[in-house]
């Protein structure tokens, strides 16, 4: 399976252009105060998991000023394991707004959970949000590691 990490805009385009015969699933990650992304229902779209959590790793910035938004919590990733265990597709699109940190964190945890045999396709910088990665690993029942995730551009 290919795990594709991308931005929200690219995910919408990719789902619109699913090739005939290709089976695709999506994990859609938005901030906690945003409306979820709607994907046009296509017969090749196997499923969509909607997750909502902010792209934060700590509560305060370097000067001690609070960000004013809640940190991701374990409950924000509820349903991830059930969704991943049931995957039966050629490609899993994992997106967040920019496609670099929350989606990279989820994709890294999924890659590790599935034994590291999938290909991770990226379109830009790959910088997993560390807190989101730890929470995703916890939801998947695996131990987070510092193992680098091989990516393909």
Predicted regions located by residue number:
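Short catalytic/ligand-binding loop motif for oxyanion handling, primarily in non-cytosolic enzymes
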Residues: 35-36, 59, 101-105
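Cysteine-dependent PTP/DSP-like catalytic domain, specifically the C-terminal lobe
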Residues: 108, 113-153
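A general structural motif
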Residues: 21-23, 46, 89-91
């Amino acid at each position: 399976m290919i795990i594709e990490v991308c931005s929200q805009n690219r995910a919408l385009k990719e789902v619109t252009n699913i090739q005939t015969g290709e089976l695709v699933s999506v994990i859609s990650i938005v901030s906690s105060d945003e409306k979820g992304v709607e994907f046009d229902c296509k017969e090749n779209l196997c499923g969509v998991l909607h997750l909502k959590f902010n792209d934060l790793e700590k509560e305060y910035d370097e000067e001690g000023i609070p960000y004013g938004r809640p940190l991701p919590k374990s409950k924000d990733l509820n349903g991830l394991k059930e969704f991943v265990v049931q995957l039966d597709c050629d490609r899993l699109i994992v997106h967040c707004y920019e496609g670099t940190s929350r989606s990279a964190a989820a994709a890294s945890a999924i890659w590790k959970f599935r034994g590291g045999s999938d290909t991770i396709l990226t379109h830009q910088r790959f910088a997993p949000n560390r807190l989101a990665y730890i929470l995703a690993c916890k939801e998947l029942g695996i131990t987070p590691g510092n193992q680098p995730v091989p990516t393909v551009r």
